[in-house]
Amino acid sequence: MHLNIILLEASLELVPKEIVNHPAVIKNAKRRNKKPEDTLLDISLHYHAMKYLENSHKRGRPDILHQALLVILTDPVIKGDIFIHTIQSKIIKVNPNMRPPKNYLRFIGLMEQLLKYGKIPINGDETLMEVTNLTLDNIVNRYDLILLSEKGEKINPEEICKLDEKWLLGIGAFPHGDFSDKILNLAKKIYSISGFPLETQQVLCRIFSACNSILGWP
C-alpha cells in the first residue's frame, strides 16, 4: 500500500546561536566532546536555555521525530515518499529503505550529523536522509496536502488508507500548539481521526493499523 507522508514543523534543529553560550548547552557539549553548535536542541537538556527562544513550546523535542520514524520505517507493508519539514523550514528527504536506530542516543548522533553535513551517510552509494533545497511550497506543488488536526473534519482512519499517490499526508511532529497559518493555508483538506488530541506516534499507529487491517494483516 502506498502512502506519502510529511512530518510537519518537526522539533529538529541544532542549538541556535542565541543560546550557544548558555551553561546548560556548554555542559552537554563538553560531556559529549562536541562543539555546542553541533549538538541537537533538546528540552530535556536545555530547558532553562530554551526559555529565551521564540516559539520554545514547539521546539527541542527530537524524540517525537524518532518515535514517528520508527513507526513509519519499520512497517513492512505501508510504503511511500517520506519527508520531514522542520521547525526551521528545512525539507529532509527520507529514504523509505532506511532503518532508523532504535536507540535514542544513536538517533541523536545521526541527526546531528545530518544537520551539520546535509546528508547521511556523508559518504556512500545510498543516501538515507538528505537536507534538500526544496521548500514546503515546492512540495505542495507536487502533491495535494492533507493535514491531520484535532480541529479537522472527523473521518475514520481507514479513509486515509484509500488515498491515491497524488496526496501527501501531513502530520505534526511538535509537542504543543497548532500548525502555522501558512501550513493551514497550504492544505487542500483537514481531517481528524479521533475525538481526542493524539500524539504523533499515536496518529501514525492508528493509521498504519487501519491500513494493515484493510490488507488483511499480511
From Swiss-Prot:
Site entry: Interaction with substrate rRNA: 61, 99, 102, 106
Record-annotated site: Stabilizes Arg-61: 63
Catalysed reaction equations from the record: a pseudouridine in rRNA + S-adenosyl-L-methionine = an N(1)-methylpseudouridine in rRNA + S-adenosyl-L-homocysteine + H(+)
InterPro entries reported in the protein's UniProt record: Alpha/beta_knot_MTases (IPR029028), Rbsml_bgen_MeTrfase_EMG1/NEP1 (IPR005304), Ribosome_NEP1_arc (IPR023503), tRNA_m1G_MTases_N (IPR029026)
GO biological process, alphabetically ordered: rRNA base methylation
Similarity comment text for this entry: Belongs to the class IV-like SAM-binding methyltransferase superfamily. RNA methyltransferase NEP1 family.
Assembly description: Homodimer.
Name this protein carries in UniProt: Ribosomal RNA small subunit methyltransferase Nep1
Upper taxonomic lineage: Archaea, Thermoproteota, Thermoprotei, Sulfolobales, Sulfolobaceae
Gene behind this protein: nep1
